[in-house]
């Protein structure tokens, strides 16, 4: 079968393998590409190609991640696999690889292990909506009752973290068998991908969400008015749309878009991902500054207090050399600007060591446009010391 070109007519989803070290995440990733390439949908990637993950920098943090792409009959997937546990934590907390769903790999020989639990918890915290389970190494377990027990244990764990443990698919197979073309195990890889196709839902694309653009720069065009530039984060900006400008001390300014410019051309509209200049009616250059956010009226509110899941960099990663304590006051770099905030640690936590990940509460000195899932870096004197995302808005 001839290799197809990248086909944009298929819906695109981002997924990844998660689970305990040595349970077979990378072998499974290789097996998926092997089985789907035999079906003519993608190029196979070997274990070594995937395991040898390149370093990437995301919000000042170095993460090793492997990106693989493949297609099923119905969808196109970008799949992320990380070599080390710390890379997973960093990847999920910083959102370096946003996941629309995940494949949880659990070795039947071990059952759920500490990192299995930790990855499910992180998935819940950072909003991975659905999880499909692949029970691996089933060929190494002779006892059918044991397999049943392991599956029950996994389902209980998913339910505990508010996933649908009762109804979610659990596929029992062997990643190595699938990779080695074993006729007993190849169908299980196909069954897994059918489960992924059916269970993991297509996400609402950014364009379909309400309009939001963080302001990067502001200038005046003589005779035409004030222009705010930035990259549209979500939604669409049309000429004639009413907007609000909020955050960083803006007292809910309202305006109307009188023009959208991109690459020095006038357009009717700009959409998520575009770098644009918006011409704003009745707004003075002095009214608006970097760090404010232009939104569809009423869609987002400014907030100053929130809870967040964060990862604190190790010394070797360029982070702090010493722990920090309650009431630590770093800067939070959100979208386009730094805001100072005060960190409150959870009860019973005296201090936070470099390399930790935990839930904190933050009080910012000035409110900013905020929603659950908003990502940020924690900085001190211009260097990144941590990263995270908002899990709950307090006020």
From Swiss-Prot:
EC number: 3.6.5.3
Binding-site residues, GTP: 19-26, 81-85, 136-139
Residues covered by the tr-type G domain: 10-204
Region ranges (G2): 60-64
Residue segments, region G3: 81-84
Chain positions recorded as Mg(2+) binding sites: 26
Region (G5): 174-176
Similarity comment: Belongs to the TRAFAC class translation factor GTPase superfamily. Classic translation factor GTPase family. EF-Tu/EF-1A subfamily.
Subunit field text: Monomer.
Protein name: Elongation factor Tu
Origin organism lineage: Bacteria, Pseudomonadati, Bacteroidota, Flavobacteriia, Flavobacteriales
């Amino acid at each position: 079968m001839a290799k197809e070109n990248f086909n944009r007519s298929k819906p695109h989803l981002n997924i990844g393998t998660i689970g305990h070290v040595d349970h077979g995440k990378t072998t499974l990733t290789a097996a998926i590409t092997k089985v789907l390439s035999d079906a003519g949908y993608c190029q196979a990637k070997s274990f070594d190609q995937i395991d040898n993950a390149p370093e990437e920098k995301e919000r000042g943090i170095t993460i090793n991640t492997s990106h693989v792409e493949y297609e099923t009959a119905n969808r196109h997937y970008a799949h992320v696999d990380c070599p080390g546990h710390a890379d997973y934590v960093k990847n999920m907390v910083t959102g370096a690889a946003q996941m629309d769903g995940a494949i949880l790999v659990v070795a039947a020989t071990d059952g759920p292990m500490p990192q299995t639990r930790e990855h499910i918890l992180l998935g819940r915290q950072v909003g991975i909506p659905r999880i499909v389970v692949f029970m691996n190494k089933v060929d190494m377990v002779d006892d059918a009752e044991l397999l049943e027990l392991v599956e029950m244990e996994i389902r209980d764990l998913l339910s505990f973290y508010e996933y649908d443990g009762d109804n979610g698919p659990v596929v029992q197979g062997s990643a190595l068998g699938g990779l080695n073309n074993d006729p007993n195990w190849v169908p299980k890889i196909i069954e897994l991908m059918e489960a992924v196709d059916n269970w993991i839902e297509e996400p609402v694309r950014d364009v379909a969400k309400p309009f939001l653009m963080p302001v990067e720069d502001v200038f005046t065009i003589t005779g035409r008015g004030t222009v705010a530039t930035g990259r549209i984060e979500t939604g669409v900006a049309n000429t004639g749309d009413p907007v609000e400008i909020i955050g960083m001390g803006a007292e809910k300014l309202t305006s109307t878009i009188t023009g959208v410019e991109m690459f020095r051309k006038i357009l009717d509209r700009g959409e998520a991902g575009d770098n644009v200049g918006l011409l704003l009616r009745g707004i003075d250059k002095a009214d608006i500054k970097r760090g404010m956010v232009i939104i569809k009226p009423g869609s987002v509110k400014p907030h100053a207090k929130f809870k967040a899941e964060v990862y604190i960099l190790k010394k070797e990663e360029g982070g702090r050399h010493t722990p920090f304590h309650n009431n630590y006051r770093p800067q939070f770099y959100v979208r386009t600007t730094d805001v100072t905030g005060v960190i409150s640690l959870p009860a019973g936590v005296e201090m936070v060591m470099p390399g930790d990940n935990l839930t904190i509460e933050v009080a910012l000195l000035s409110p900013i446009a905020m929603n659950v899932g908003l990502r940020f870096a924690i900085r001190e004197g211009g260097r990144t010391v941590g990263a995270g995302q908002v899990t709950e808005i307090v006020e």
